[in-house]
Amino acid sequence: MIFNCKVKKVEASDSHIYKVFIKPDKCFDFKAGQYVIVYLNGKNLPFSIANCPTCNELLELHVGGSVKESAIEAISHFINAFIYQKEFTIDAPHGDAWLRDESQSPLLLIAGGTGLSYINSILSCCISKQLSQPIYLYWGVNNCNLLYADQQLKTLAAQYRNINYIPVVENLNTDWQGKIGNVIDAVIEDFSDLSDFDIYVCGPFGMSRTAKDILISQKKANIGKMYSDAFSYT
């Protein structure tokens, strides 16, 4: 469905990630893990909805974390739309990699960069629905300065006994005490058998496809219990 939107709030972080809160002209239902398509200067740009479906008056999008022209252009577009209160168009909701909240299986959530927005929606929904099974969240970034939601996730892990948060930094450039390297390698190191897990993945396209291939071949992951919109493309 097509909606006209306005930007109601923009939150910047030290890591150059922007949380953009947009308000559609009509509320619509979506599932945790779905995304919107923003029409921007003749381009169709997908953004995961970062908030829980129970909070649908404003949609939270995470923008940035990349020097790619599309990311810079999107940030500029949203900031200008906020300053001048210009309307823009989205198409929503989209995506089949939504949370299967009826499942009792443990959850493995894997995010790369701003792929955390997708994972954040799923995690927030798990908390809202009081799901009690173990939840493991692995978040991989290039350097620790890009962990823009690190404290928020640490707080949730401390508050809920079933949530385990594991940040992974690929390039060490400071006094980092956590895991170092590729986020998929970190998962491989920590698990021997993923056959019972529901696995949700979001990040760069190559990372998502690599996660699928490696976790199935090396860790017995069940393809029927793995979810990522990247899996829809060959």
From Swiss-Prot:
The keyword Flavoprotein applies. The keyword Flavoprotein applies. Keywords: FAD, Flavoprotein, Luminescence, Oxidoreductase. Its EC number is 1.-.-.-. Pyridine binds at residues 112-116. GO terms for molecular function: oxidoreductase activity. One of its GO terms (biological process) is bioluminescence. Probable flavin reductase in the luminescent systems of different marine bacteria. NCBIfam families: PRK08051.1 (NF005963). Belongs to the Fre/LuxG FAD/NAD(P) flavoprotein oxidoreductase family. This is Probable flavin reductase. It comes from Photobacterium leiognathi. The gene is luxG.
